[in-house]
């Protein structure tokens, strides 16, 4: 698979036009609170890069009974699938948290295309990635490979056939730090082109038709 760079650039611009600048993105405190808005009882869910599978418990707390499947190349925990290419079935929701930045850009595109193919029509994909406007979030981990700006991630998803439904900055901190970073220091951050939010979360839908 190769990337059509001109089309990716156009989809990036379309994403920026839809959501504005990084500082225009609304703030949510936790990724699972975003997820909770986009599912319900009986949903079939695939988590890619599932780690210890603890996300399943959060889903059950929110929605009750769900069909949860996990995929991870790390054999530390037992998973339903060892690679996204091995995944079978169709899903209402596919999630990948803090995963895509560990891939090359080509592999990232392969992953979102594969996610699109595994979703039911009208199904939802939710991804998070470090916010490149908050440099420590990406730079502090040597296993991070590809920094993805919010419009770049949106462009990849649009290029794969998704429609973007929502995009947020994720930020949770003490009240004192929130006051300092979100209000007192905000003009300085914006002037020098950085942000206080550590992650970006994107909600994308596979069109019904």
Question: What label would you give each PLM region?
Answer:
Residues 51, 130-135, 147, 170-174:
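Short "lid" loop at the C-terminus of a central beta-strand within the Rossmann-like core
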Residues 77, 134-139:
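A short acidic, helix-capping loop that chelates divalent metal ions and anchors anionic groups
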